[in-house]
């Protein structure tokens, strides 16, 4: 069993422990629970879904990477599919604070990358900050999203973000978690003084980055982008750009890829190479921040691919 789960698992009821431990122990566990698994755990613990999420919050918080604040926040996104997705805050040494990921962003991005279509609720162990409330308002569930906090009655996002400004005010039709595929194609490599050759078209890192960019959410700037990361063991993780109506709460594609890596139990210091794919001649670029943050994590083979329709 992964050691980081041990303290949280020790606090659950014996019946729930018996049902939960084998799931966490499985080599393929990657920070989310399928609807059948959720039902099994609810029955074992005699809990409804919201109560189960509160019980599981310490497991989500165990994913936190907090070398700066040492303040661990966990969140669980509840999809309409019945699946549950863990998220936690992530901080990166030697990178700007703006690269930090909040737990709520982590859980939402995790659900998005796993193919969830809509969220019913978000359970979190601390009150969401204003940044996260604005990020949540980009979702296709909008202000109907239910926020669940310990020792408080569940309430909608509308109650936490009154008089909200969001994509609907800008007549944006495509919302975060809506299914979309822009079908971008590779245009040209923009590799910057790399000694390593650019990947060929059959490289899974290229196809993964292309697909991620095609499914990214950038309705304001049209600067769609995606990232693919390959670790030392050969595993590949995708990340998509999630733009926000308020701009600043936008989540870069590198961060969403790191969220997926963290959920899978991978070490972000083991990234061997990466590809950033972004739209040709777009008004903004993810390149400087992506390259700098990956360098801080010890990855120096970062390829830059421009895209066309």
Curated annotation (Swiss-Prot):
Binding note for cofactor: Binds 1 zinc ion.
Catalysed conversion reaction: cytidine + H2O + H(+) = uridine + NH4(+); 2'-deoxycytidine + H2O + H(+) = 2'-deoxyuridine + NH4(+)
PROSITE patterns xrefs: CYT_DCMP_DEAMINASES_1, CYT_DCMP_DEAMINASES_2
E.C. designation(s): 3.5.4.5
CDD domains recorded: cytidine_deaminase
UniProt key word Zinc: yes
Catalytic site positions: 104 (proton donor)
Binding residues annotated for substrate, in chain numbering: 89-91
Gene Ontology MF: a single term: zinc ion binding
Cofactors (names): Zn(2+)
Classification via SUPFAM superfamilies: Cytidine deaminase-like (SSF53927)
Domain CMP/dCMP-type deaminase: residue ranges: 48-168, 200-309
Biological process annotations from GO: cytidine deamination
Binding annotation for Zn(2+): 102, 129, 132
Pfam families named in the record: dCMP_cyt_deam_1, dCMP_cyt_deam_2
Oligomer and partners: Homodimer.
Family membership: Belongs to the cytidine and deoxycytidylate deaminase family.
Job description of the protein: This enzyme scavenges exogenous and endogenous cytidine and 2'-deoxycytidine for UMP synthesis.
Family annotation (NCBIfam families): cyt_deam_dimer, PRK09027.1
Protein name: Cytidine deaminase
């Amino acid at each position: 069993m992964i050691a980081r789960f041990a303290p949280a698992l020790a606090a659950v009821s014996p019946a729930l422990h018996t049902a939960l431990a084998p799931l966490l122990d499985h080599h393929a566990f990657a920070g989310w629970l399928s609807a059948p698994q959720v039902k099994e755990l609810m029955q074992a613990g005699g809990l409804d879904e919201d109560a189960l999420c509160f019980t599981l919050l310490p497991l989500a918080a165990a994913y936190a990477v907090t070398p700066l604040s040492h303040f661990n926040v966990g969140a669980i996104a509840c999809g309409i599919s019945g699946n549950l997705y863990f998220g936690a805050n992530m901080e990166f040494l030697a990178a700007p604070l703006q690269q930090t990921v909040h737990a709520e962003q982590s859980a939402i991005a995790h659900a998005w990358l796993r193919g969830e279509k809509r969220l019913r609720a978000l359970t979190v162990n601390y009150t969401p900050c204003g940044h996260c409330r604005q990020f949540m308002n980009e979702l296709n569930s909008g202000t109907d999203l239910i926020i669940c906090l310990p020792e408080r009655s569940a309430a909608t996002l509308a109650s936490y973000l009154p008089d909200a400004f969001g994509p609907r005010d800008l007549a944006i039709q495509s919302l975060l978690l809506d299914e979309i595929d822009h079908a971008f194609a590779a245009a040209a490599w923009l590799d910057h003084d790399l000694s390593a050759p650019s990947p060929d078209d059959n490289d899974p890192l290229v196809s993964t980055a292309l697909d991620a960019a095609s499914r990214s959410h950038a309705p304001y700037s049209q600067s769609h982008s995606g990232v693919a990361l390959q670790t030392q063991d050969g595993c590949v993780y995708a990340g998509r750009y999630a733009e926000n109506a308020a701009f600043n709460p936008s989540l870069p594609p590198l961060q969403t890829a790191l969220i997926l890596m963290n959920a899978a139990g991978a070490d972000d210091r083991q990234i061997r190479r990466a590809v950033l794919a972004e739209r040709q001649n777009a008004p903004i670029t993810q390149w400087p921040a992506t390259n700098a943050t990956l360098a801080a994590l010890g990855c120096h083979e970062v390829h830059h691919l421009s895209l066309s329709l």
